[in-house]
């Protein structure tokens, strides 16, 4: 395996042809099963690790095995770097962004990547404030196996915040009873601010089935504290909001600090809101 690529894949070559390999790491020696169909006229192939012969020091046992390689009992997707240690994940992202800045933008720059507060202690889990699933033929919440329409029933979602998991348990989501094929969405604002409170979400959550509210509230209250100022937002349960529990704080704080830095030495300024 030669180098990092996109979508949690790495680059290798077979008979001179590029192969994008899932669940690999640079400098590893692995056995790969190629995705079908493929033929020798293809510009590149894709495949997945089925055996690791010489592992990288950044390789770990997947914390969520169901999202790991299919040959190792996984295959549902949703956690592309589940086989990579937390420091290795930061290295992967920093190198990938730096390479793209150089290749596409012709800018050579170091890209610092930092974890949000609480991420390390949680082992990289429990950060999603929204999850989406599909009901299988038995009405159980499930996820599709990667690259197929096959549905794999799940009884938890390790990437979801603990607050969301508490709501899912309280609303009996994991017990099933859904119409087969229905789309299930949980939106649970994580209490935000300088100190994150993991208390119960009261009715500030939504369980939606095929876009219709089943439990909670259609309008959710999101709260973000930036540099000591708290902002409240009303967001539709079907609407967009940053998925990571700390992303709005990090993004908002960074932008405000950049703007303040420009304004401090300027008589006037134009700020573009994209």
Q: Whereabouts are the PLM-identified features?
A:
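Accessory RNA-recognition modules of RNA-modification enzymes
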Residues: 1-274
């Amino acid at each position: 395996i030669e180098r990092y690529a996109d979508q949690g894949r790495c680059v290798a070559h077979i008979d001179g042809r590029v192969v994008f390999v899932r669940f690999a790491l640079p400098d590893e020696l692995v056995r790969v099963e190629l995705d079908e169909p493929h033929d020798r006229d293809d510009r590149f192939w894709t495949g997945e690790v089925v055996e690791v012969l010489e592992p990288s020091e950044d390789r770990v046992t997947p914390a969520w095995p169901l999202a790991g390689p299919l040959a190792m009992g996984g295959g549902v997707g949703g956690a592309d770097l589940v086989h990579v240690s937390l420091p290795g994940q930061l290295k992967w992202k920093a190198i990938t962004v730096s390479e793209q800045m150089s290749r596409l933008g012709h800018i050579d720059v170091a890209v610092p990547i930092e974890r949000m507060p609480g991420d390390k202690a949680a082992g990289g889990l429990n950060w999603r404030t929204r999850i989406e699933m599909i009901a299988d033929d038995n009405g159980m919440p499930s996820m599709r196996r990667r690259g197929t329409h096959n549905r794999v029933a799940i009884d938890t979602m390790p990437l979801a915040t603990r607050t969301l998991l508490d709501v899912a348990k309280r609303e009996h989501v994991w017990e099933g009873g859904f119409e087969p094929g229905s789309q299930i969405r949980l939106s649970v604002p994580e209490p935000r601010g300088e100190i994150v409170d993991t208390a119960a979400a009261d009715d500030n959550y939504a369980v939606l089935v095929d876009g219709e509210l089943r439990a909670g509230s259609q309008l959710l209250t999101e709260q973000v504290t930036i540099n000591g100022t708290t902002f409240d937002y009303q967001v539709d349960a079907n609407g967009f909001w940053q998925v990571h529990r700390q992303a709005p704080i990090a993004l908002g704080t960074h932008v405000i600090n950049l703007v303040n830095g420009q304004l401090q030495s300027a008589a006037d300024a134009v700020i573009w809101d994209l």
